[in-house]
Amino acid sequence: MHCPFCAYADTRVVDSRLADDGGSVRRRRECPQCGQRFTTFERAELALPVVVKTDGRRESFNEEKLQRGLTRALSKRPVATARVDAAVRMIQRRIRERGEREIPARLIGELVMEALRDLDPVAYVRFASVYRRFEDVDAFSVEIARMKEAEVPDGGDDLNRGD
């Protein structure tokens, strides 16, 4: 790596540590030419597929949009941030595992609903009401009944355990 201070072409790593809970590596580097030290971060670049919207438009997958949607649905609900972050990672992992270059936005919505069902039933119904465009109280009742039928007796998946 080039030195950002003198542009010397070869710096050396003096120290490496895991950062971001193992999601990246923090490296301290030193330039043998000018003696300056600086920090770099290294993380895997994992491309997510392009999202195909219902109207046919295509846009890049946006992790922040996913995080915002979950956070909005969970607003004022007793769910730890670590669990929301775990849900975002789980959704991204499931999308990557499909191995497709494009995915429908509908699939992301369904994955979000699945995660919310495990995180908080109130947030799930809140999100479902917007996502599925509930028109009346009966739609809420039907969704709640469907949710109760699908309840998992052992407490759900890893999202219920926290990180």
UniProtKB/Swiss-Prot annotation:
Please give the family membership noted in the entry.
Answer: Belongs to the NrdR family.
Q: Which GO terms describe its biological process?
A: negative regulation of DNA-templated transcription
PANTHER family assigned to the protein according to its UniProt record, in alphabetical order: TRANSCRIPTIONAL REPRESSOR NRDR
Source organism superkingdom: Bacteria
- Where does the ATP-cone domain lie? 49-139
What InterPro entries is this protein classified in? ATP-cone_dom (IPR005144), NrdR-like_N (IPR055173), RNR_NrdR-like (IPR003796)
Zinc finger regions, unnamed = 3-34
Gene this protein is translated from: nrdR
What is the name of this protein? Transcriptional repressor NrdR
Say if the entry is tagged with keyword Metal-binding: yes
* Function of the molecule: Negatively regulates transcription of bacterial ribonucleotide reductase nrd genes and operons by binding to NrdR-boxes.
- State any single GO MF term: DNA binding
Sorted alphabetically, the keyword list is:
ATP-binding, DNA-binding, Metal-binding, Nucleotide-binding, Repressor, Transcription, Transcription regulation, Zinc, Zinc-finger
Question: What remark does the entry make about the cofactor?
Answer: Binds 1 zinc ion.
Q: Which cofactor does it need?
A: Zn(2+)
* Keyword DNA damage included in the entry's annotation: no
Organism per entry: Acidithiobacillus ferrooxidans (strain ATCC 23270 / DSM 14882 / CIP 104768 / NCIMB 8455)
